[in-house]
């Protein structure tokens, strides 16, 4: 939220971008719930007071567009609703390939990367590390089911096999059976997929059941990896914001330190308060150490900005600028202007980082890859071990495997996750009936033949 305020404030001070226009905003928290998201959108469309669909009761200003949501689960129904009214929507989260359909969703754009790019990055990491037998774990919803299948297909195309796709539901007995199956699997690697778990209790339950497995944590889970569940895991994070922007954002936050909204949403969440019981509870829930915050510092987690939000707000502002510039000295009906805005966001192009709003799968993406491990005080620490870069022409993975801290003792070797051991020289693979190609037996080579490479 603070990134939104910072960006709007910066735009309003720029007299060249939107002269004689002041941007404002309404902020609603969807909590990743589609019902809350739709309710919030209808409230904004109706104006203050009771929600009245198809009526706009705001007495001043007009809606330029919507920023959000981060979750595809809530972004999809928002896109369906806003498509009826013709309002521009710019999401700052990962984008389901379904939303790429410009016929169905002409008003939807995103500053986040496409889910398929993340799937490719994970599949190439699995291939690079020589893992051929993995498990995919997701929560039980329609989007996760579709995303899990897409990820499984991508992993298969890169030569590995998926033992099974596990889903966690609201039923504890079902979850126990799923997690017991993970425990018994010969796969050492579990790849998390889709949205994060709904409750902290589910995190701790999963941690207890599969504590010996190595996790691959996608970008969508990055805000939750402080939990001990992710000890010994590999994590993707999108590389964002240069140092100058972080400095500017920090300066902005410190300048409004007396803002009660800022205090409520940030300072009390990460800093010691006068309520010791609350401090103890929050530190236990978030597994994070609080600090005695002064007015000259902020905890790092609170001021590391989301570049996706920053670019989404600027994208909307530049689209509005382009629309107004193309219609100078013309009277434009607000309704017509609203429905034309999406045509101008297609041509928005940022110089500090190449991004094309009109093609969700063409914008270059760069992920940092981290090895997560717990320290003596049980805090999760990260070491950057590599990066993955993706452009329309293809991807590039660079990783230093020697820096990875594995959950198990691997004798300084890369962790193995295979259904079957490599066949030694002199032996060949024999397929098992009904089993995936990664699961096989080894048999002696026929007389007069020999396998000279291990694994053939």
Segments from the language model and where they lie:
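Extracellular ectodomain signature
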Residues: 1-24, 30-43, 47-50, 55-74, ...
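Flexible loop/hinge segments that line or gate small-molecule binding clefts
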Residues: 93-107
């Amino acid at each position: 939220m603070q990134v939104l305020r910072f960006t709007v404030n910066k735009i309003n001070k720029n007299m060249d971008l939107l002269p004689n226009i002041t941007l404002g905003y309404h902020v609603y928290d969807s909590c990743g719930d589609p019902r809350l998201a739709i309710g919030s959108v209808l409230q904004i469309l109706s104006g203050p007071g009771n929600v009245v669909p198809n009526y706009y009761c705001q007495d001043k200003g007009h809606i330029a567009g919507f920023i959000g949501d981060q979750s595809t689960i809530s972004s999809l129904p928002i896109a369906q609703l806003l498509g009826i009214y013709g309002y521009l929507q710019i999401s700052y989260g990962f984008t389901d390939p379904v939303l790429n359909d410009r016929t169905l969703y002409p008003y939807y754009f995103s500053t986040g990367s496409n889910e398929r790019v993340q799937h490719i990055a994970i599949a190439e990491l699995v291939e690079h590390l020589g893992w051929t037998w993995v498990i995919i774990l997701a929560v039980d919803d329609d989007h996760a089911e579709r995303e899990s299948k897409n990820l499984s297909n991508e992993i298969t195309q890169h030569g590995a096999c998926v033992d099974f796709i596990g889903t966690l539901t609201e039923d504890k007995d079902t979850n126990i059976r799923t997690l017991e199956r993970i425990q018994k699997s010969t796969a050492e690697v579990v790849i998390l997929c889709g949205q994060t778990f709904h409750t902290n209790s589910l995190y701790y339950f999963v941690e207890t059941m599969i504590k010996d497995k190595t996790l691959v944590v996608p970008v969508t889970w990055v805000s939750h990896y402080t939990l001990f569940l992710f000890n010994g895991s590999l994590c993707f994070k999108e590389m964002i914001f240069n140092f100058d922007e972080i400095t500017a954002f920090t300066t902005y936050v410190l300048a409004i330190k007396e803002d009660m909204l800022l205090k409520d949403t940030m300072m009390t969440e990460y800093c010691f308060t006068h309520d010791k019981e609350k401090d103890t509870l929050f530190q236990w829930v978030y597994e994070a150490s609080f600090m005695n915050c002064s007015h000259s510092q902020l905890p790092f987690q609170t001021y590391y900005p989301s570049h996706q939000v920053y670019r989404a707000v600027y994208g909307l502002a530049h689209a509005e600028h382009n629309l107004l510039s193309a219609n100078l000295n013309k009277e434009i009906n607000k309704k017509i202007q609203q429905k034309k805005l999406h045509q101008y966001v297609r041509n928005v192009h940022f110089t500090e980082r190449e991004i094309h709003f009109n093609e969700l799968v063409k914008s270059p993406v760069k992920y940092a890859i981290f090895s997560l491990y717990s320290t003596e005080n049980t805090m999760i620490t990260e070491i950057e071990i590599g990066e993955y870069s993706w452009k329309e022409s293809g991807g590039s993975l660079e990783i230093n495997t020697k820096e990875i801290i594995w959950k198990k003792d691997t004798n300084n070797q890369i962790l193995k996750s295979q259904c079957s051991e490599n066949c030694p020289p002199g032996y060949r693979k024999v397929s098992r009936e009904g089993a995936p190609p990664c699961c096989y037996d080894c048999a002696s080579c026929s007389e007069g033949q020999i396998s000279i490479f291990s694994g053939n």
